[in-house]
Amino acid sequence: MEQVMNVQPLTHKDRPALEAMDTGIEDDYVVRIFERLIESDSHELFGLFREGKMLAVGGYSLFGSGKFAMLGRLRSDRRSLMKGNATELLQPIVDQLFRDPMVAWVGANTHLHNHAARRVLEKLSLNQGPVLHFLTLKSPKLLTAHESGPVWEEVTDLQHKKELIHSTEMNELGVFPFECYYPLPYDNALFTDQHLEKSSFYQNPDASRFVIVKSDTKKFDYSHVKYFWNDHYNQPGFFETILHHWKQHPDHVGCWIDFSAEGFKNIPDLSPYDVQEPWMLYGKWK
């Protein structure tokens, strides 16, 4: 007799079922911040259940006043892998999101070499997007072969910030790195006054380049660098500028920088960085 599986949003009563899953993830942050996730207005978490047991968990986060939905936090019980549980969980979630009149885009960010996750996303009809490299600059004394220069001039005027950010819709990253781990389509819905006011903008002397640095927390605190070109090492003062921001925030563990595939190739020496496996962004517009 076939056992019925069902997908349902998680509530406080589901914590024991979540903790009983064998995911192989030590100190899983989803368990650690479970209550925060299920109580949030911008995050949803769902479970795939069979006879009261949770086989998989996953959900989404909303950005840009609900215009963008990023799938994530997918975990499966290792005792029931390769049974299609991830797709079984995510398909109704994606269907629900595309029925939501507020949502215009659904996406997911996964490791380039995570072929199992990529197969799931392709089954969900999400399209491949750019490959991105997330590096954290932690040892600036090891930086070599970059053009030194003065710290770029800070831009504090809100209107000037808007003009700058609207000038780079077509950029070499192919995305807007909204938060650490969360690259999104470059869209005005993300550029609220509040977001821009909390972001530090710096412009180089000939006004041909600018960089945005915003404090962000993903377990640790980072100076999150948003730069839309691939010439990090050729722009005088670029590294002095982002290190200036880090020095103003000594509690940060480093400068998190999103590099395109081409920008990553241009790095002469990776020793100053913590280097993650490359990521691929998937997504689909309505």
Mark where each language-model region is.
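Conserved beta-strand-loop-alpha-helix junction that forms the acyl-donor binding cleft
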Residues: 106-118, 256-265
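Conserved beta-strand in the GNAT
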Residues: 47, 53-61, 70, 203-216
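Non-catalytic interaction/regulatory modules that flank or connect domains
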Residues: 149-233
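Conserved acetyl-CoA-binding loop-helix of GNAT-fold acetyltransferases
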Residues: 76, 82-97, 119, 234-246
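Conserved catalytic-core motifs of GNAT/GCN5-like acyltransferases
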Residues: 109, 127-143, 272-285
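A conserved beta-turn-beta hairpin within the catalytic core of GNAT-like acetyltransferases
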Residues: 62-72, 81, 214-225, 275-278
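Short amphipathic alpha-helix that is part of the acyltransferase structural core
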Residues: 1-32, 141-183
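Active-site rim helix/loop that mediates acceptor-substrate recognition in acyltransferases
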Residues: 23-51, 59, 170-201
